[in-house]
């Protein structure tokens, strides 16, 4: 999965997919009542990027729905996965459940079109704080209450705080999560970070009793770091330059081992060669 980083304006969906992304990451900020409010990152952000592009969250979902609904004039067949980077740092811990509830209602209405031919992309809820695991509970219980529990088949999870892998496993246990887990690791492109924790995550993914289904690394903009991440065995790379990742994937060293994921590749299943 080539994951376009910080896609917060509707116009950027086309831009990143046209550069080669089959997945995008979108920032979601919340108001003080835990309503998802804007797709917005703010300053500071990655080096070389404009930090302040934004839409209202529900407006963005409408654009995203069009981009992922077959038959729509804006449809991109290859856009198959969306990571919502949930900026829950502005919330109190006890608001996490409410944030999950409100997020589910927004997606149900504006993205899934109440289950009636809505957008088809797989969704990853990426949460920065392990203490906010109840966001997952709130999300799940709301879809059940709204009589669309089947939509959870399209939803996965990530804790993005680079926490100890054992601690992440405990948070999933509390949230009752037993699958659909993406594990992120990384740092802003302005700084360097080694691959030690990525290797631990990959080892967990590949073990018989691990909790991780997929591993992605962020934010990778250079060919050398792309090769290092691929050599470590990641499933996804988040980038500001999808064309760079696509270029490296077309090198002879990688064409035999990797291919770009399509809609038929289940993002919740471990890839077995």
Curated annotation (Swiss-Prot):
Keywords: Cytolysis, Dermonecrotic toxin, Disulfide bond, Hemolysis, Lipid degradation, Lipid metabolism, Lyase, Magnesium, Metal-binding, Secreted, Toxin. Disulfide bonds join 45-51, 47-190. It is found in: Secreted. It comes from Loxosceles sabina. The active site is at residues 5, 41. Dermonecrotic toxins cleave the phosphodiester linkage between the phosphate and headgroup of certain phospholipids (sphingolipid and lysolipid substrates), forming an alcohol (often choline) and a cyclic phosphate. This toxin acts on sphingomyelin (SM). It may also act on ceramide phosphoethanolamine (CPE), lysophosphatidylcholine (LPC) and lysophosphatidylethanolamine (LPE), but not on lysophosphatidylserine (LPS), and lysophosphatidylglycerol (LPG). It acts by transphosphatidylation, releasing exclusively cyclic phosphate products as second products. GO terms for cellular component: extracellular region. It catalyses: an N-(acyl)-sphingosylphosphocholine = an N-(acyl)-sphingosyl-1,3-cyclic phosphate + choline; an N-(acyl)-sphingosylphosphoethanolamine = an N-(acyl)-sphingosyl-1,3-cyclic phosphate + ethanolamine; a 1-acyl-sn-glycero-3-phosphocholine = a 1-acyl-sn-glycero-2,3-cyclic phosphate + choline; a 1-acyl-sn-glycero-3-phosphoethanolamine = a 1-acyl-sn-glycero-2,3-cyclic phosphate + ethanolamine. Binds 1 Mg(2+) ion per subunit. GO terms for molecular function: lyase activity; metal ion binding; phosphoric diester hydrolase activity; toxin activity. One of its GO terms (biological process) is killing of cells of another organism. Its cofactor is Mg(2+). Belongs to the arthropod phospholipase D family. Class II subfamily. Expressed by the venom gland. This is Dermonecrotic toxin LsaSicTox-alphaIB1aiii. Mg(2+) binds at residues 25, 27, 85.
